[in-house]
């Protein structure tokens, strides 16, 4: 009897939570500025994305989008270690800290805004692989630019390498139809800010330079 009451209470709490969340989403979506930005964002997205594209560039963009899952960053870290770059482990630790912060931040923001993916609005967009539900902001882009700011600050050469890859991943997320341009732009800003703050934190904690190397 008591267990049934507890189960009912849990169900009621979940239902109320869903209703509050839906009410918040509806409020945000009905704001004039939100509607205006969504219209511009949607038009820009449709110009970038075209479902009839074929060829090597589209295949390359698909590859870059998948590399954003973490494979390319792991390879680059391994390369840093193999080339015996001084304090590679510290730079790895700093980047890892930035990544964990990014994951926490973008999961919270995605849950708060609950913006639909482009494929849910446009029927002609094929799903390349099952992504998570929400679009805003782009988690891949956030992580890419946080890592680039963290590790790319080691030298000018590493900055060019990391930022080039991060930019390609960011563009590919729109090109293959997984994100709107605004998702990616906000991901760039948030990722860069998190990367900068992480660099500053490691500087004050252990003296690892914000820009450059020891």
PLM-predicted stretches and their roles:
Residues 123-214:
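Membrane-embedded catalytic cores of phosphoryl/pyrophosphoryl-handling enzymes
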Residues 2, 6-132, 142-169:
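Hydrophobic alpha-helical bundle signature of multipass membrane enzymes
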């Amino acid at each position: 009897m008591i267990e049934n009451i507890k189960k009912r209470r849990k169900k009621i709490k979940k239902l109320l939570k869903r209703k509050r969340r839906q009410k918040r989403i509806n409020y945000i979506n009905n704001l004039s500025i939100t509607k205006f930005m969504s219209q511009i964002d949607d038009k820009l997205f449709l110009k970038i994305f075209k479902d009839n594209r074929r060829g090597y560039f589209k295949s390359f963009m698909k590859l870059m989008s998948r590399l954003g899952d973490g494979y390319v960053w792991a390879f680059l870290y391994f390369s840093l270690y193999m080339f015996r770059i001084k304090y590679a482990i510290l730079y790895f630790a700093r980047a890892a800290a930035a990544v964990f912060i990014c994951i926490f931040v973008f999961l919270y923001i995605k849950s708060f805004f609950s913006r639909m993916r482009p494929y849910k609005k446009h029927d002609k967009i094929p799903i390349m692989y099952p992504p998570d539900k929400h679009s805003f902001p782009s988690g891949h882009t956030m992580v890419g630019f946080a890592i680039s700011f963290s590790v790319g600050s080691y030298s000018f050469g590493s900055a060019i390498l990391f930022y080039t890859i991060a930019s390609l991943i960011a563009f590919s997320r729109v090109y293959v139809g997984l994100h709107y341009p605004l998702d990616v732009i906000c991901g760039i800003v948030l990722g860069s800010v998190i990367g900068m703050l992480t660099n500053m934190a490691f500087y004050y904690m252990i003296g690892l330079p914000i820009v450059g190397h020891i």
